[in-house]
Amino acid sequence: MQIILLEKVTNLGNLGDVVRVKDGFARNFLIPQRKARRATEAAIADFAVRRAELEKLAAEKLAAAEAVGTKLKDLVLEIGQKAGVDGRLFGSVTNHDIADALKAKGFTIEKSSVRMPTGPLKMVGDHPVAVAVHTDVVADITIRVVGEQA
């Protein structure tokens, strides 16, 4: 299916690009989230009229994301979890736990935006984690896992 991107999508394209994607990806993800539209002649003509408005909206989203990114930069977030004597956690700290802790601090971050390169955290200590606030803005934060006695 050919679609017009209404905003920048990671690994796919930028605003206004006409790209070919699998039907399910378009129908189940891109179109319902208003990230894309079917590339019909009417849609392409409508997009040409609305392009300036959409670019302005994208610039505003980017500016807001950069503001959140600067607040998040070098943030140290403490998360308590039950741990054994050797420092291993009973369970783990996942991206869901980190997103909940960030929401408690006043940030609106989705759990899918938390990128953990080494997977869930299973040890007590400081761990670097990347938070993708926007496709162009990634903030590095430190998660300090504090062990609580079981």
Swiss-Prot record:
SUPFAM superfamilies to which the protein is assigned, alphabetical: L9 N-domain-like (SSF55658), Ribosomal protein L9 C-domain (SSF55653)
Gene Ontology CC terms, in alphabetical order: ribonucleoprotein complex; ribosome
Keywords tagged on the record: Ribonucleoprotein, Ribosomal protein, RNA-binding, rRNA-binding
InterPro entries, sorted: Ribosomal_bL9, Ribosomal_bL9/RNase_H1_N, Ribosomal_bL9_bac/chp, Ribosomal_bL9_C, Ribosomal_bL9_C_sf, Ribosomal_bL9_N, Ribosomal_bL9_N_sf
GO MF, any single term: rRNA binding
PROSITE patterns the UniProt entry points to: RIBOSOMAL_L9
Record GO biological process: translation
Entry function: Binds to the 23S rRNA.
Family: Belongs to the bacterial ribosomal protein bL9 family.
Cited PANTHER family: 50S RIBOSOMAL PROTEIN L9
Protein name according to UniProt: Large ribosomal subunit protein bL9
Organism: Polynucleobacter asymbioticus (strain DSM 18221 / CIP 109841 / QLW-P1DMWA-1)
Name of the coding gene: rplI
